[in-house]
């Protein structure tokens, strides 16, 4: 079966017009299976990247768009911002097909892999707005993680908020530096950093560079999507067939 013959994964797109290179979950070249987009109206950065609970109208728009993807034959759905972890339970209850809203949903499994003592670092787009509510929504004890945001006046924020031209070299330097600082801060507590989870969907293209510098497992929406889809659509590897 070729990748084009596989059932599609749905993607809830938001109203943020930015460059999305391979590795970004919006880009079809990121995935080894078909991807179908559905734009959610009223989904700008300031509405999504929030520490406040989403209101009913906001959730309803995501539900409506998610149901459209289900009607198009999508076997599951992912989204374009890790802050949508705060909507995980509501969306999974109402859309009708499995949905993985955020890279953060992997953390309970990562915790099981690592054992109870190691700290999981979260690198996020905005460290001021990502907090306990997002974590608890996906079953994460805030005491077991440490959060670090990208610089408030850095390149990534300027690209998304101010439409500054995307510079991949600058993005990589900023993300690698922030991840190194995150892991260093954990070690300065006298704790061991077990893994880093990249919250932002702009981060996966730079995950390998981050891992090279921090030296621990690195998870993101790409690792989530591959795991998620592999259970939705099982394929028997050719090497298994005699």
Where in this protein do the model-derived segments appear?
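N-terminal glycine-rich anion-binding loop in soluble enzyme alpha/beta folds
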Residues: 1-59, 126-129, 133-167
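Metallocofactor- and cofactor-centric catalytic cores in central/energy metabolism, strongly enriched
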Residues: 2-3, 8-14, 33-76, 80, ...
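Gly/Ser/Thr-rich loops at beta-strand to alpha-helix junctions
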Residues: 17, 76-88, 103-106, 125-129, ...
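Short, well-ordered secondary-structure micro-motifs
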Residues: 22, 112, 132-135, 209, ...
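Short, acidic/small-residue loops that bind anionic groups at enzyme active sites
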Residues: 90-114, 211-229
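Conserved mixed alpha/beta catalytic, RNA-binding, or beta-rich assembly cores of soluble enzyme
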Residues: 92, 99-107, 112, 116-126, ...
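A short, acidic, amphipathic alpha-helical segment used as a generic capping/interface helix at domain edges
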Residues: 171-192, 205
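C-terminal functional extensions of proteins
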Residues: 199, 203-205, 219-242
């Amino acid at each position: 079966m070729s990748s084009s013959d596989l059932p599609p994964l749905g993607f809830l797109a938001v109203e943020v017009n930015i460059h999305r290179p391979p590795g970004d979950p919006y880009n079809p070249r990121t995935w080894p299976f078909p991807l179908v987009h559905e734009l959610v109206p009223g989904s700008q950065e300031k509405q999504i990247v929030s520490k406040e609970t989403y209101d009913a109208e906001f959730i309803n728009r995501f539900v409506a768009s998610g149901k459209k993807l289900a009607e198009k034959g999508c076997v599951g759905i992912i989204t374009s911002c890790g802050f949508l972890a705060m909507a995980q339970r509501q969306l999974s209850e109402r859309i009708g097909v499995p949905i993985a809203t955020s890279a953060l949903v992997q953390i309970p499994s990562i915790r099981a892999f690592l054992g109870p003592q190691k700290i999981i670092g979260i690198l996020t787009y905005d460290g001021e707005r990502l907090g306990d509510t997002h974590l608890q929504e996906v079953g994460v004890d805030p005491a077991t993680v440490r959060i670090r945001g990208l610089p408030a006046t850095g390149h990534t924020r300027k690209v998304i908020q101010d439409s500054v031209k995307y510079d991949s070299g600058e993005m990589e330097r900023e993300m690698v530096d922030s991840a190194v600082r995150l892991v260093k801060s954990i070690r300065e507590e006298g704790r061991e950093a077990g893994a880093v989870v990249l919250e932002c969907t702009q981060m996966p293209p730079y995950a390998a560079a981050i891992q090279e510098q921090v030296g621990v497992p690195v998870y993101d929406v790409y690792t989530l999507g591959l795991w998620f889809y592999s259970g939705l659509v099982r394929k028997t590897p050719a090497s298994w067939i005699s």
